């Protein structure tokens, strides 16, 4: 299930090349003397790290945890920055380009929340100040739910396109690890309801089964269970509310669980598909 995507676009126009050069000299940053062809852009890693420093300073002042610069998110940001450079305009999604959740998921990162800032400006320091002065952009920069960011900066003459892709990244687990996390959650819920632990059964029809984005046991396996629960979530141990009813049922004695991880059209950011059987 996708969480809301937060996006923001910022265009600063009417800045002369001379003003741009003066601002960059004052901030100590380097501006390429010759613009790169749009088909072969050179991304400014130093400027990206400088932007990260400004972002994390602002987050520290706001009492928020620092963001980690993530390589997969940076690759996604660079790909979108290349699109903006080639088209000569700002956008969060061009015709034929996937939406943000898909773009980030295609790079292999696992997450459940995302946001994006894009801007066109003339210096690292100035673009950060402008983003912080805009409510929507500032919200992304200081969002406490984000823990990682990818940043791309590409110059065209003395001005730059900037992309900041934010995400709340989550750990990924092998099937067995995910199943163990779910089993631990079941044990915790049984303890909270003062019921004896359920005996966990190994079920080869469930373990690692993943078909079309669902953990699907065969019909024979299903017929032996008193209750079957299937769900999907970016975090396998985040059980749906209805799970509490069956786990808290004193008549249940045993259970088995199967989980698999997949990216689907509905879940481009990745999700665990889980089936639990109670006996």
Question: Residues of each region from the PLM?
Answer:
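Bacterial N-terminal signal peptides
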Residues: 7-16
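Positively charged n-region of N-terminal signal peptides that target proteins for export
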Residues: 1-4
């Amino acid at each position: 299930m996708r969480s809301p995507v937060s996006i923001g676009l910022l265009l600063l126009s009417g800045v002369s090349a001379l003003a741009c050069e003066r601002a960059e000299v004052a901030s100590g940053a380097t501006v390429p003397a010759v613009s790169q062809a749009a088909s072969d852009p050179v991304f400014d890693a130093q400027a990206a790290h400088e932007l990260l420093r400004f972002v994390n300073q602002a987050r520290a002042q706001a009492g928020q945890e620092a963001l980690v610069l993530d390589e997969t998110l940076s690759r996604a940001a660079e790909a979108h920055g290349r699109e903006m450079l080639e088209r000569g305009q700002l956008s969060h999604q061009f015709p034929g380009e996937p939406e943000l959740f898909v773009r980030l998921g295609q790079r292999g990162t696992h997450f459940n929340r995302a946001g994006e800032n894009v801007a066109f400006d003339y210096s690292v320091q100035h673009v950060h100040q402008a983003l912080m002065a805009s409510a929507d952009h500032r919200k992304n920069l200081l969002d406490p739910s984000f823990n990682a960011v990818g940043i791309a900066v590409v110059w065209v003459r003395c001005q730059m396109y900037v992309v900041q892709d934010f995400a709340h990244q989550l750990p990924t687990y092998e099937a067995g690890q995910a199943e163990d996390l779910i089993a631990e959650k079941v044990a915790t819920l049984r303890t909270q309801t003062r019921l004896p632990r359920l005996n966990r059964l190994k079920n080869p029809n469930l373990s690692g089964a993943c078909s079309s984005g669902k953990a699907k046991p065969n019909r024979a396996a299903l017929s032996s269970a008193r209750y079957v629960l299937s769900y999907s979530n970016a975090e396998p141990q985040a059980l749906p509310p209805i799970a509490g009813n069956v786990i808290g049922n004193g008549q249940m004695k045993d259970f088995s669980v199967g989980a698999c991880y997949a990216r689907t059209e509905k879940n481009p950011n990745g999700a665990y598909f889980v089936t639990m059987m109670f006996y």
